[in-house]
Each structure stands twice: as structure tokens, then as C-alpha cells.
């Protein structure tokens, strides 16, 4: 009887040990979504969405490319999967295991802006006539302010740096102005909007909102 009890006890200990061993080996996996704000040769800087827990650790993460990732474009939204803890230096660093490009959000905004331009009155060059002709689509863009601002402002900056300023850029500037009411300015062109907004962001203004903070990250 004692021998049987001893054997049962050993079996329990072995099973418990195996269970603990299995638990210890379980990977500590996390993920978050954010926006690319800087592209480098072997890494990129990503700003987590404010709704993500990681944002409480840092507003910037240095993400090393993995699995041959080569689609870094400022303004794109990505999902980052990582293992272990956050190294809270600045920018924060993590052990990245996977990078996924969330292109649907960007494509939706791009398609709607292009639709406004393509369906506008042929005889008019007035941006407000184009918006009036596709008011429903324009309002849909305003209904998703964060997505729209991220794409529109990123594209504005890229166009500005390439000395480009067209009807699409003007509509993007209008969207940014309507979404971010923290900066109010009656601009004459998309380039004019970008230049004056950059001046505003360089001031010591104490009440920058989330759109201003995102814009400052893009401009760094």
C-alpha cells in the first residue's frame, strides 16, 4: 500500500514538473498597431496608436525589419508583433517577430479622395465645387478623422518635399484643417498650409492635441 502511494506521489510530482516546465516555455507574445513616422535602412520608427497599451511606455518604437520586410513608407499603418518586455529607452526597443502592413485603411482614404477628384465638375477648378459634388464621400472621410488625417497629412508632406501642389493636395489640406481645429488658417495653397502649420508646430504652444503631436513626429 505504501509502495503504491509512493509511486502515485512520484507521478504527481513528475506531471507537476512537466506542467510548470510547459508554462515557463510559453512565449510572452504581444502586438500593437501604429503609424510609421520614419524609415531607415534596417529599421523604422513607429508611433503606437493612443489606444494601445504600448503608447503608455513610449510614443516612439524602433522596429528592426524582420522576415525581409521592405515596404516602409511614412504614414503607413502597421501591426507589430513582439516577444518579451519593452526596453524603455527612447525610442523604445522590442524583440520584433512579425510586421504586418495594414494597407486597407490607407487605401480606403486614398480611394475616396481620388473619387472626389475624378467625379468633380470638368469645367471647374474650384476644390469646393468638387467637394460639393461628392459631399457624402467627403463627409465619410471626416467621420474617420484619425485615419483620414494620418494619410492626408503624410501625403501632404511628401508632396511638399517634392515641390508638388495640386487639387488632391488642396483637398487633403482642407480635410486636415477641418479635422484638426487646433490650427485655423485660411490658406491659399496646400504648400501654404504646410508652411504655416510647420510654423505653428514650432512654437511654444502649450495645448498641442493628438493631431499636432502626430504631425510633429512626421516632421522630425
Question: Where are each of the predicted segments found?
Answer:
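Positively charged n-region of N-terminal signal peptides that target proteins for export
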Residues: 1-4, 9
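Short, flexible, surface-exposed loop segments at domain boundaries
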Residues: 20-40, 68-104
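Extended repeat-based scaffolds of very large eukaryotic assembly and lipid-transport proteins
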Residues: 104-220
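Short hydrophobic/aromatic-rich beta-strand segments that constitute the beta-sheet cores
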Residues: 45-46, 80, 150
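C-terminal motif of bacterial Sec signal peptides marking the signal peptidase cleavage site
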Residues: 14-17
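Short, cysteine-centered beta-strand-loop-beta hairpins and adjacent loop/turn segments enriched
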Residues: 52-55, 87-89
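Beta-strand/loop nucleic-acid-binding surfaces
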Residues: 54-71
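Short aromatic-glycine-enriched beta-strand elements
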Residues: 39-49
Amino acid at each position: 500500500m505504501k509502495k503504491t502511494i509512493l509511486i502515485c506521489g512520484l507521478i504527481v510530482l513528475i506531471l507537476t514538473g512537466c506542467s510548470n516546465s510547459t508554462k515557463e516555455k510559453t512565449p510572452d507574445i504581444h502586438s500593437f498597431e501604429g503609424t510609421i513616422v520614419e524609415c531607415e535602412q534596417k529599421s523604422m520608427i513607429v508611433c503606437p496608436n493612443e489606444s494601445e497599451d504600448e503608447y503608455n511606455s513610449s510614443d516612439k518604437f524602433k522596429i528592426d525589419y524582420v522576415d525581409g520586410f521592405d515596404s516602409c513608407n511614412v504614414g503607413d499603418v502597421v501591426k507589430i508583433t513582439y516577444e518579451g518586455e519593452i526596453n524603455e529607452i527612447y525610442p523604445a526597443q522590442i524583440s520584433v517577430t512579425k510586421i504586418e502592413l495594414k494597407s486597407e485603411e490607407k487605401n480606403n482614404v486614398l480611394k475616396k479622395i481620388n473619387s472626389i477628384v475624378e467625379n468633380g465638375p470638368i469645367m471647374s477648378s474650384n476644390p469646393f465645387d468638387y467637394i460639393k459634388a461628392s459631399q457624402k464621400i467627403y463627409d465619410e472621410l471626416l467621420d474617420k478623422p484619425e485615419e483620414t488625417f494620418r494619410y492626408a497629412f503624410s501625403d501632404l508632406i511628401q508632396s511638399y518635399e517634392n515641390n508638388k501642389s495640386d487639387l488632391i493636395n488642396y483637398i487633403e489640406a482642407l480635410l486636415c484643417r477641418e479635422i484638426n481645429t487646433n490650427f485655423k488658417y485660411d490658406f491659399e495653397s496646400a504648400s501654404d498650409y504646410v508652411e504655416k502649420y510647420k510654423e505653428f508646430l514650432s512654437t511654444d504652444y502649450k495645448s498641442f492635441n493628438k493631431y499636432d503631436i502626430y504631425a510633429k513626429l512626421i516632421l522630425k
